[in-house]
């Protein structure tokens, strides 16, 4: 299975294009890195691939077909700031159940403690919230995971643990991963191949 973006263009006006004629392809089981400076359109491209942006040029497809806007999205996007992806009025146990029932194995893999489940989002740290976001995203119907600077808020040891768990789970489930980061050393450790926004988008 392939997630493809073809001739992707995006901008708030014709004289200020953030993306122009960008092509990207990610296969099942691939771990692909995406590197670029701030302002080069990395996050915008992620949002387009995951269906968050609608007013773009070009085509996004899953094995040649348009991704349905209803039901569970097989392309899951994890944001740099997880607090933006949770409902502050829900307890964490309810947030986890939003898309599917998360297995105990995945909860344990990400070190999610049982007493965290009855807390509100504002009672957890950014790193703890990110663990919930990852557990929720790695559902049985997920085919691709887009990770946009997801471990910038944690220390190096925690970063290594989180990525070790992600890579183990996605390998088992044959999920393709797009790892977006400005940290080239992290990208080189994790990824099978690397794309540079300077090559894709000329910036």
What name fits each language-model region?
Residues 50:
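Helix-to-loop junction immediately C-terminal to a conserved catalytic motif
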Residues 81, 88-102:
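Q-loop/switch helix immediately C-terminal to the Walker
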Residues 120-124, 128:
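Conserved ABC ATPase signature
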């Amino acid at each position: 299975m392939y997630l493809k973006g073809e001739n992707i263009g995006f901008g708030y006006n014709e004289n200020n294009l953030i993306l122009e004629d960008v092509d990207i392809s990610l296969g099942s089981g691939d771990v692909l890195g995406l590197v670029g400076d701030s302002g080069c359109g990395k996050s915008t491209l992620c949002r387009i691939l995951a269906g968050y942006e609608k007013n773009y040029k070009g085509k996004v497809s899953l094995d040649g077909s348009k991704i349905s806007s209803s039901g569970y999205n097989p392309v899951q996007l994890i944001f740099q700031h997880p607090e933006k992806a949770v409902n502050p009025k829900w307890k964490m146990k309810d947030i986890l159940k939003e898309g599917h029932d998360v297995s105990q194995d995945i909860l344990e893999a990400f070190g999610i403690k049982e007493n965290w489940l009855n807390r509100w989002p504002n009672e957890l740290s950014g790193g703890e919230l990110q663990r919930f976001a990852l557990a929720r995203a790695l559902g049985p119907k997920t085919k691709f995971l887009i990770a946009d600077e997801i471990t910038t808020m944690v220390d190096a040891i925690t970063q290594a643990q989180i990525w070790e768990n992600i890579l183990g789970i996605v390998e088992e489930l044959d999920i393709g991963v797009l790892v977006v980061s400005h940290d080239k050393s992290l990208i080189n450790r994790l990824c099978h191949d690397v794309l540079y926004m300077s090559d894709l988008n000329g910036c």
